[in-house]
Swiss-Prot record:
Subunit architecture: The 4 large subunits of the cytochrome b6-f complex are cytochrome b6, subunit IV (17 kDa polypeptide, PetD), cytochrome f and the Rieske protein, while the 4 small subunits are PetG, PetL, PetM and PetN. The complex functions as a dimer.
Cofactor section: heme
Membrane topology: Single-pass membrane protein
Record-annotated membrane-spanning stretches: 291-311
UniProt keyword Acyltransferase, yes or no: no
A Pfam match: Apocytochr_F_C
Gene3D superfamilies in alphabetical order: 2.40.50.100, Cytochrome f large domain (2.60.40.830), Single helix bin (1.20.5.700)
Name listed for the protein in its UniProt record: Cytochrome f
Domain of life: Bacteria
One cellular component term from this protein's GO annotations in UniProt: plasma membrane-derived thylakoid membrane
Record-listed heme binding positions: Y41, C62, C65, H66
C-alpha cells in the first residue's frame, strides 16, 4: 500500500513539474515571438535606463526609440500646499485621422504613453484622498511608478490615443512637517509624451515603422514579397556578387527591379506618423505659514495706505480751515 501511495505521489509530482516547465516554455516563447511587434512605450525606459528616465543632457530616454519630434505639454499648479491633492495634466495632441503601421504591416490607430517626473516626495494620491468629483475622470486610468524607490516618477500607457490625449495624474504633495528630507521651495517638473510606435527597439534593431536602406551598391535584379516577412531585395554588385536585403511589411518601396542603388541609399518611405515630445515646468511647495504672513503683510500695507489717505484728508481740512480764518 505504501509503495502504491509513493508511486502515485511521485507520478503526480512529475506531472506538476512537467506542467510548470511547459507553462514556462510557453511564456518565454510568447515573450520572444511577440517582442519584435511590441510597441516601444514608457515601460521600455525601465529596461534601458533603470536608474532614471532622464539623461544627464536633460533628454528623456524615450526619445532614443521614438525619433519623430511632436508637441507635448504639461500643466501643474504654480504652487501647492503640503499634504494636498492636485492635478498634473500631460497633453499629447495629434491628428486622430492618421493611422500608423502595426507590427504585421497593417494600419491601425495610435496609442499614447506618458512619463511624469515629479520632485521627490510627490506621488500618486491614494484612492481615499482623491476628491469624489474626480473619480469619473480618473476611473479608467492606471499609473505605475518607475521603480519601488521612485514613486515620484510615474508611467502611463499605452492607451488608445483617441481617448487619452490629455492624461490627468492625481498627485499628493509631501509634508515637510512629517518628512524632514522634504523642504519648501521651487522644484522642476519634467514630462514626456509619446504617440505611436517607435522606430528603434531598446536593443538597437529597427522596427517596421521607419525607413530602410540598402546595404550594398549595385543593380536591383529581383524583388519578392512574402506575407509576414516582407520584401526581399536582391542586388547584384559591380563585383557580380549577390546581396539580399530584407524590408519588413509596412514601409513602401521607392525602388523597382532594374534600378541602380548606392550603399546606404534609402529605398522606402517613412511610415512613421507619431513621435515623442517633452516639456518642463516648475512647481512651488508653499509653506502655509508663509502664505498667512504674506496675507498679513498685504493687509498691513492696505491699512497703512488707508491711514495715509485719511491723514491726507485731515490735513487738507485743517489747511482749508486756516485759509478761511
Amino acid at each position: 500500500m505504501s509503495k502504491i501511495n509513493l508511486s502515485t505521489m511521485w507520478s503526480s509530482f512529475i506531472k506538476k513539474i512537467a506542467k510548470t516547465i511547459l507553462v514556462a516554455i510557453a511564456c518565454i516563447s510568447l515573450f520572444l515571438t511577440s517582442s519584435p511587434a511590441a510597441n516601444a512605450y514608457p515601460f521600455w525606459a525601465q529596461e534601458t535606463a533603470p536608474a532614471t528616465p532622464r539623461e544627464a543632457t536633460g533628454r528623456i530616454v524615450c526619445a532614443n526609440c521614438h525619433l519623430g519630434a511632436k508637441l507635448t505639454e504639461v500643466e501643474v499648479p504654480q504652487s501647492v500646499l503640503p499634504d494636498t491633492v492636485f492635478k498634473a495634466v500631460v497633453k499629447i495632441p495629434y491628428d486622430t485621422d492618421v493611422q500608423q503601421v502595426l507590427g504585421d504591416g497593417s494600419k491601425g490607430g495610435l496609442n499614447v504613453g506618458a512619463v511624469l517626473m515629479l520632485p521627490e516626495g510627490f506621488k500618486i494620491a491614494p484612492e481615499d484622498r482623491i476628491p469624489q468629483e474626480w473619480q469619473e475622470e480618473l476611473a479608467d486610468l492606471y499609473f505605475m511608478p518607475y521603480s519601488e524607490e521612485q514613486e515620484n516618477v510615474l508611467l502611463f500607457g499605452p492607451m488608445p490615443g483617441d481617448e487619452y490625449q490629455e492624461v490627468v495624474f492625481p498627485i499628493l504633495s509631501p509634508d515637510p512637517a512629517t518628512d524632514k528630507s522634504i523642504h519648501f521651495g521651487k522644484y522642476a517638473v519634467h514630462a514626456g509624451g509619446n504617440r505611436g510606435r517607435g522606430q528603434v527597439y531598446p536593443a538597437g534593431n529597427k522596427s517596421n515603422n521607419t525607413t530602410y536602406n540598402v546595404s550594398a551598391s549595385g543593380k536591383i535584379t529581383d524583388i519578392t514579397f512574402e506575407e509576414y516577412v516582407g520584401n526581399q531585395i536582391t542586388i547584384e554588385t559591380p563585383d557580380s556578387e549577390t546581396v539580399v536585403d530584407l524590408v519588413p511589411p509596412g514601409p513602401e518601396l521607392l525602388v523597382a527591379v532594374g534600378d541602380t542603388v548606392e550603399a546606404g541609399q534609402v529605398i522606402t518611405n517613412n511610415p512613421n506618423v507619431g513621435g515623442f515630445g517633452q516639456a518642463d515646468t516648475e512647481i512651488v511647495l508653499q509653506d502655509a505659514n508663509r502664505v498667512k504672513w504674506l496675507m498679513a503683510f498685504f493687509a498691513l500695507v492696505m491699512l497703512a495706505q488707508i491711514m495715509l489717505v485719511l491723514k491726507k484728508k485731515q490735513v487738507e481740512k485743517v489747511q482749508a480751515a486756516e485759509m478761511n480764518f
